[in-house]
């Protein structure tokens, strides 16, 4: 009886472990997408998303990371975010007195975002892309303001760039609070420096609608 019970418990534990694996880096499994991201160092890392995920705390891409999140081809996975979007950071080279960009790529993913804030809580934006190259590769990105608040849909801060490639469709709407923008960028603490490119290629499209101030504001 004891052996049978132990075997049953082990089988149940194995089944739970298998079901709980949300993402993989190589053969290593993770129970959350954020855990998989946190495991990355400065070397390029590819994360395979195994399941659809629904997030209320957003995603944080730490300084210096180079992360690609793949969501499959035959059955693309969905990343749903409610309340908070994405916060990325770069690294500062004190000797060179310049920022080194981080890199974040979503590939074959569906992103469904309803947010007005980000995990860092700064920038008055749903997605704070700070000193980072953000690439959307064959991605469907649909984003709406959670409550029509005053912040922007995305803030490209300092040395940040946005690339839409391979048929990506990005739609941002509903940021119609006072002086709200779909995508916002300025030269805060980065005056007269090369930064903040938005490049759209390979039959991709960027649609920003129903915002108060400017759909895309670069000052």
Predicted regions and their residues:
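Extracellular beta-strand/beta-solenoid scaffold signature
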Residues: 55-60, 80-97, 112-129, 143-159, ...
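Right-handed parallel beta-helix/beta-solenoid
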Residues: 11-35, 52
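Flexible, charged surface loops at secondary-structure boundaries
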Residues: 37-43, 61-63, 99, 129
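N-terminal extracellular ligand-recognition/capping segment immediately after the signal peptide
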Residues: 28-30, 44-67, 74-83, 111
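Right-handed parallel beta-helix
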Residues: 70-75, 102-115, 133-145, 161-176, ...
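Bacterial N-terminal signal peptides that target proteins for export
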Residues: 1-8
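Small side chains
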Residues: 23, 72, 126, 167, ...
């Amino acid at each position: 009886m004891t052996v049978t019970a132990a075997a049953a418990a082990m089988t149940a534990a194995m089944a739970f472990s298998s079901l709980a694996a949300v993402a993989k880096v190589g053969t290593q499994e993770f129970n959350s997408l954020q855990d998989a991201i946190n495991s990355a160092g400065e070397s390029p890392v590819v994360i395979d998303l195994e399941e659809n995920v629904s997030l209320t705390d957003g995603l944080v891409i730490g300084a210096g990371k180079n992360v690609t999140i793949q969501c499959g081809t035959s059955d693309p996975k969905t990343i749903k975010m409610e309340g908070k979007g994405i916060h990325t950071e770069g690294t500062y080279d004190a000797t060179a007195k310049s920022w080194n960009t981080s890199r974040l790529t979503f590939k074959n993913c569906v992103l469904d975002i309803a947010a007005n804030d980000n995990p860092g809580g700064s920038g008055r934006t749903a997605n704070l892309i700070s000193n980072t190259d953000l690439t959307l590769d064959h991605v469907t990105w649909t984003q709406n303001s959670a409550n029509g608040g005053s912040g922007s849909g995305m803030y490209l801060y300092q040395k940040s760039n946005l690339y839409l490639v391979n048929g990506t469709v990005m739609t941002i709407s509903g940021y119609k609070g006072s002086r709200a923008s779909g995508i916002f960028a300025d030269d805060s603490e980065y005056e007269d420096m090369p930064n903040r490119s938005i490049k759209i290629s390979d039959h991709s499209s960027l649609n920003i609608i129903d915002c108060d101030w400017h759909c895309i504001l670069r000052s």
